[in-house]
Swiss-Prot record:
Gene Ontology MF term list: indole-3-glycerol-phosphate synthase activity; phosphoribosylanthranilate isomerase activity
Gene: trpC
Protein name: Indole-3-glycerol phosphate synthase
Source species taxonomy: Bacteria, Pseudomonadati, Pseudomonadota, Gammaproteobacteria, Cardiobacteriales
Top enzyme category: lyase
Pathway: Amino-acid biosynthesis; L-tryptophan biosynthesis; L-tryptophan from chorismate: step 4/5
Highest taxon, organism lineage: Bacteria
Amino acid sequence: MTKILDDIVAYKQQEIAALKQQKTEASLIAELETLTDAPRGFMRALRDCRDRGGVAVVAEIKRASPNQGLLREQFMPELLAQECVQYGASCLSVFTDTHFFYGDVAYLSAVKKAVPVPVLRKDFIISRYQILESRLLGVDCILLIVAILTDEQLQEFVVLAHDLGMDVLIEIHDENDLKRALNVPVRTLAINNRNPEDFNASLEKSAQLRQQLPKDYFVISESGINTHADVVYLLNCGLDAVLIGGALMSAEFAGEALHHLIYGKED
């Protein structure tokens, strides 16, 4: 792992330990027994959009990022979510990490109530506890980052998430991650175009890694997607969907920005 990811994991370990002091894993499991709602199909929504000939987009709702700083002064996740769905997002992603991305689980809960589309929890998941918590929060899909997990954790966490009815998105950064991801029983991958060491993004990473994956994998490109030309380039390279955050959150009107990214600006 890089120094940045090491720091994030160390902080997460402390965060989870504190959460367990407030509520035990056994308590979470007991609460899960009372759930009656079923998760929305995150992957199904993206596949359906792609198969209809549309541009499958995951719009990311986030307040800030380590490389860009604060993206929105006025941050109203429910309204942003509604706007993005209105303008073409098939699914949403919500950052719940508080320390590095100024996210919050409350943002995710608010978004789930505001829109009918599936929602991905964007966080650094390193524990069973977070997966159980995710289901209780109404999460439809969790993100597992290969670089911060062992092979054993990847297998265990995928099984647990699926047992709870949630979809799983596996995130990779490089060829080493890709090789490990091929051993995980999930055929939905996200290629993060950003270098975790310096945060520079290269769309060519998605193009190159996609060619090394089996054709039946559903592959999402994320990070550094800022223009309609970027979206067209990635789709032409065989990517199945795109996840867009910063370009939307930094725009005055997120929905209009999304429309332009999908369809291009009108003359």
